[in-house]
Amino acid sequence: LSEMICEYADDPEMIAYAKSKGAKGITVSGVCCTSNEVAMRRGIPMAGNFLQQENVVLTGACEAIVVDVQCIFPALGPLSKCFHTKFITTSPIAQMPDSEFIRFNAATAAENAKAIVKMAIDNFENRKPELVHIPQMKQKATVGYSVEALVKVLDGVANTQVDEMGTTKPLIVCITSGVIRGAVAMVGCNNPKIRPDYAHIE
């Protein structure tokens, strides 16, 4: 669904429709794990992590927040009602109070995404400029470890005189020779009970 939303947010027809409603264009931002996916594959900016999802609504600049089946704070519904934000759920097993439900289905993904993007555009006119506050804090990040990302990193450390460039061969050689004895994935959402990213950095 996120991929299709990105497609329609970039569609010239939808952009023209947004401009006809007074917007400068369409901005899609991601939160949590889906954010990592669309940031890695499409360069879509991240608005925050799991713990920051409510802050996205608090900016007053979010026309719609769309969720699927996990990592959803129950307060998003009531919070969205305090602003103009449309809170949209897309999974029948994760419908929530104070949300609008658009059932996502792979067979109708394009239709679902177009409806969601149009709903967000139509909601732009309800934005209250006096409530909009977008923090100017920005942070660089490396997101996603696709094969392409790994190859790029490996090319940066490989010896161009002897190593084959543009492949995962340097990593494979390090693993098979025992230089690298394993890999660890540090994954999971932050927990409101502990300091953010505590499990990852300490």
Regions found by a protein language model. Give the residues of each.
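Metallocofactor- and cofactor-centric catalytic cores in central/energy metabolism, strongly enriched
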Residues: 1-202
